[in-house]
Amino acid sequence: MPIKSRIRAIPDYPKKGIMFRDITTLIKDPVGFRLVIDGLTQRYLENGVDFDVVVGVEARGFILGSALAYTLGKGFVPVRKPGKLPADVVSQEYELEYGTDKVEIHLDAILPGTRVLLVDDLLATGGTALAAAALVEKVGGVVAEMAFIVNLPDIGGERKILDKGYRVFSLTEFEGE
């Protein structure tokens, strides 16, 4: 069974008209989780994307990013919600459909010139990914690529990210579904 078929669809969540793609059914399954980590590992061992560290976005990006960093022998840096990091931070606000939110990274988490693979579970609007990329750049890092389990191209996040000059990779997508 492929990755896509292991992802649960929940209609009208978190609000009416939204088809929520729930990856918990994928990652709770040891075969499904292995498919994800092996698929990403293969991508970064074989496709010449040069990077030094994996950055994962809270919360599901931590699950993927830390496992991927381990398999590739890289370090892992968390991008967190406000107030969760104990040392000096840099913040980035971003737009949500219903307001704004913010993410943070430790000021010393990434050295200038460090090449970063940014990882999260799902790409929809691109707001969180672009905010995380802005954080990486504020502390002097360079985003080599952004990787996701799921891309929802109909929502437009992939186009926004590509238009900003970033590379995007996803293991699967739900287009027109």
From Swiss-Prot:
The keyword Glycosyltransferase applies. Pathway: Purine metabolism; AMP biosynthesis via salvage pathway; AMP from adenine: step 1/1. It is an enzyme of class 2 (transferase). One of its GO terms (biological process) is purine ribonucleoside salvage. It catalyses: AMP + diphosphate = 5-phospho-alpha-D-ribose 1-diphosphate + adenine. Keywords: Cytoplasm, Glycosyltransferase, Purine salvage, Transferase. It is found in: Cytoplasm. Its EC number is 2.4.2.7. GO terms for cellular component: cytoplasm. It comes from the Bacteria. Pfam families: Pribosyltran. CDD domains: PRTases_typeI (cd06223). One of its GO terms (molecular function) is adenine phosphoribosyltransferase activity. Homodimer. HAMAP family: Aden_phosphoribosyltr. PANTHER family: ADENINE PHOSPHORIBOSYLTRANSFERASE (PTHR32315:SF3). Catalyzes a salvage reaction resulting in the formation of AMP, that is energically less costly than de novo synthesis. Belongs to the purine/pyrimidine phosphoribosyltransferase family. This is Adenine phosphoribosyltransferase. It comes from Chlorobium phaeovibrioides (strain DSM 265 / 1930).
